[in-house]
Amino acid sequence: MLFRSGLQDPTGRIFRLKPDGALDCFLGGIPSPNGLVLNKDESILFIAVTRGNNVWRAPIMPDGMPSKVGVFIQLSGGGGPDGMALTADGGLVVAHAGMGSVWVFSPLGEPLYRVRCETGITSTNVAFGGGQNRDLYITESESGHILKARLPLPGLALPHLV
């Protein structure tokens, strides 16, 4: 998947590269698409919509196109969602640029935890690692730091590509 947004096109789009090599628009009309993450079975794409200050949920049909796209999580405050990751149980972890926080949501979108970044307000990305995959690494671009928080639940292990 590719995404594109900017001054030349304020409505943002996400493109997909099909197995036959053709590139087509997966979804358009998105106010600043940013972080993208697929659920474990790759049937749902979550999209951090920075300018809308929300996260969209896009179920993917068998033909590879989205269906019934809508707001999954509405955030508040300055900035908006940026990078994301998944917990092992299908919850969503969202870096909130402009608020200096990372939010951990249940698979149903309920807020479970808030991790505050003490070094700045521009938390931009997240990734799991460490023992039992419970360490959450957070990039904070205002200060240039990489922070680590130990969570009570593990992150989804990413498949290793060979």
Where are these regions (language model features)?
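Flexible "stalk/tail and boundary" regions
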Residues: R16-D20, W103-Y113, I121-T122, F128-G130, ...
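Short loop/turn segments immediately following the C-termini of beta-strands
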Residues: F3-S5, T50, I60, A97, ...
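Short, structured loop/turn "capping" segments at alpha-beta junctions
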Residues: Q8, G21-F26, L45, G52-V55, ...
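Short loop/turn segments immediately following beta-strands, especially the blade-tip
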Residues: A58-M65, R150-P159
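Loop/turn-rich, solvent-exposed surfaces of beta-rich toroidal or solenoidal domains
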Residues: N53-V69, I73-P111
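Beta-propeller fold detector
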Residues: D24-G28, P66-Q74, Y113-R116, A157-V162
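A short loop-to-beta-strand structural motif that recurs across blades of beta-propeller domains
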Residues: G12-F15, N54-W56, S101-W103, H145-L147
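Beta-rich, blade/repeat-based domains predominating
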Residues: F3-R4, Q8-I14, L23-I44, Q74-L92, ...
